[in-house]
Amino acid sequence: MHIRTTEQFPYSVIEEDLRIPMPDGTRLYARVWRPDIAGPEHPVPVLLEYLPYRLSDWTAPRDAQRHPWYAGHGYASVRVDVRGQGNSEGLPGDEYDETELADGVAVLEWLAAQPWSTGRTGMFGISWGGFNSLQLAARAPESLHAVVTVCSADDRYDNDVHYTGGSVLAVDMHAWASTMLAFFSRPPDPRHIGDDWRDMWRQRLEALDPLIHTWLDHQTRDDYWKHGSVCEDYSAIQAPVLAVGGWHDPYRDTVLRLVEHLPREGTAPVRGLIGPWSHQYPDRGLPPGPAIGFLQETLRWWDHWLKDEDTGVLEEPLLRSWISESHPPATVYPELPGRWVGDARWPSAGVTMTTWGLPGAASAGPVLVRSPQHTGVDAGRYFPFGNDSDLPPDQREEDSRSVCFDYDPLAEPLEILGRPRVRLRLTSEVPRGQVIARVCDVAPDGSSTLVTRGVLNLSARHGRDRVVDWEPGATEDVELDLNGIGHAFPAGHRIRLALSSAYWPWVWPQPGSAAGWSVEPAASALDLPVRDAVAAGDAERPAITFEEPEQAEPLDVRYPEVPGQRPERVVVRDVAADEWRLEVDPRYGGTRIYPDGLEFTEDALETYTIGASDPGSARTRSDWSIRLRRPELGWDVRIRVRSEITADGADFRTWNEVVCAEGETEVFRRCWERRIPRTAG
């Protein structure tokens, strides 16, 4: 899709770098884009994006397309680096810790008090910035009048990168912890900081502690995870929220929960928007599309709440969502076929949870589900970013490693919208295990497209805040909610429910997972949220449309070609050892050269290994390298991070190493090794 670049705005834009003082004297690095009229005579509302990702380089290309656009439409748009990151002073902390959130409140107060500010602020962001926008809204700072949160979560334990269904999310807990260790090791930029950069860097390095330690120390939903989880008290959010997600983003269920639990009307209402997108802003044009004019859509939100203009945002349905038409399996889709629908309430009057008994249940006895441990190698990327190998390929191989229940071919089309639920009667002979359920769209040619899935750690079946081991030999009924989805099954296709006892590397295998478990089909069912267009009132509502994507002029960043680039995603089988290895290049950025002369190179490789019959053989490894170079200053810094995780029945074992060099001289090296008791995950 073509993305229009806009160079002419209603207002000319002024860009300025600032240091924002915190109550303890620490200064946070900020960049503000303001309309040229902004001042005491013509104050403007302020928008804040607050991230740890380095505004002077890492997010600079994205920032250049968004913040000047808002400024050109009459807002002061501000990007701030979190304490201890980028060119901000102080030491790095944990995700969304108390210091970060207290600083965020102070930043909003400072921005509201500036002579060019009306005193009304809005906050927006994707992922981390979407998280802390919600978290700060729950603190109800006086100036915060509106929020746009994109691809974020209301539940830090069960809907983030650490745990899923009570199980350790092996694929992303480790990868993200290693990424953060590499990111936290980056120095300030001497072009912006001057000679103090080296002392600041040394202080940051000495304060490092791998976050994987903390995350594995908290294997159930305790107070650590409740901090920053706005689902603990939705009523604390006192600002209007536009919640945005994509069906191919792991955080999409947060949008469904927010539109259910936040008020539809009043002084702080919510509106939800879920498209076909991955973990990206909806206007970037990255697969899967279609992209939308997201900046224009958010401008309507800001103008309504920060300028008191009637833009019609409250006349929109509570939830606007994309329902994808059936499509052949592929690892990337430039655009998906489908349509936009609107629902005035959530749960919607147009959606009915319909029970589907398992096929053949009347004549079937207990069925053993005992999957090989490499089931899951075709799961696709947990965080799709629009890369060529992100999405799950044809699921037939995964289905062959699972127990599948195929329904009869549909006599007529069937649309679902929401979160399917699977109810199972299980018998397990071991105390620990996990259930993975997938719903697939099976075409007449046999191809199997993943529609949605879900995970349950059986020891978390009575709640994510407790561990209840299974009594060997006992039979119990369990339920698991699958991820939300909007999907249209066509007539002639089959719906498939696939059950497995392993899903590597998404789920770290439990010690007894090789034993599997038995399911009683006659006492089990699949519940589907079936949407009826008539009951939903589609014909009575104007068609849902969006403008074409539009952005400010892109930053002139050069990306030199890298010869011999390795594949993004490779599955290797060692036949003699019966071992499977998944190698992933997350494509974080390669080499780029910025207009100010900075050369920035990143490389990452993730490796996930497991034996087909041995859950104790699971191993994850992450290798990171970063180089920052300014030839005109003689500045050349290199960072290397290596980390591994293994586990047995009793403990997780972690190993992390950080090595930093200035030029050819090593200036820092530290290694951490820990054994962490395996209490739940």
Identify the function of each model-found stretch.
Residues 2-42, 406, 410-412:
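N-terminal cap/lid segment of alpha/beta-hydrolase-fold proteins
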Residues 37-112, 161-162, 437-445, 504:
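Cap/lid segment of the alpha/beta-hydrolase catalytic domain
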Residues 63-64, 72, 138-236:
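Accessory cap/linker subdomain of secreted extracellular hydrolases
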Residues 115-127:
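Alpha/beta-hydrolase fold nucleophile elbow
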Residues 126-135:
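Glycine-rich nucleophile elbow surrounding the catalytic serine of serine-hydrolase chemistry
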Residues 237, 243-245:
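Short beta-strand/loop motif that positions the catalytic acidic residue
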Residues 273, 281, 287-661, 665-681:
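C-terminal, loop-rich substrate-recognition/catalytic regions characterized by aromatic stacking residues
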